[in-house]
Amino acid sequence: MKVTLIAILTCAAVLVLHTTAAEELEESQLMEVGMPDTELAAVDEERLFECSVSCEIEKEGNKDCKKKKRKGGWKCKFNMCVKV
């Protein structure tokens, strides 16, 4: 009986400590208003970026978008990057 009671109390104590540690970690990872740019840069490094490509017609009318060509056609370049 005593062993079961000790096991239950130990398990409850571990659960409380784990929950408290998880809440503290979550609070430390939240961004605050007025956060310096250096801290924001660290947050941005962890995020992935998706970049879209825009194409502009240089000389030859309505051709499909191709990679950079040296003579006429379409010229493609990165347009913008979006955080995911």
From Swiss-Prot:
Keyword Disulfide bond: yes
The keyword Acyltransferase belongs to this UniProt entry's keyword annotation: no
Tissue: Expressed by the venom gland.
Residues that make up the propeptide removed upon maturation: 23-47
First and last residue of the signal peptide: 1-22
Domain of life: Eukaryota
One example GO MF annotation: toxin activity
Record's keyword terms, sorted: Disulfide bond, Neurotoxin, Postsynaptic neurotoxin, Secreted, Signal, Toxin
A Pfam family per the record: Toxin_20
Subcellular compartments: Secreted
SS bond partners: 51-65, 55-76
GO cellular component: extracellular region; host cell postsynaptic membrane
Similarity annotation: Belongs to the neurotoxin 12 (Hwtx-2) family. 02 (Hwtx-2) subfamily.
Function noted in UniProt: Postsynaptic neurotoxin.
Name of this protein: U4-theraphotoxin-Hhn1aa
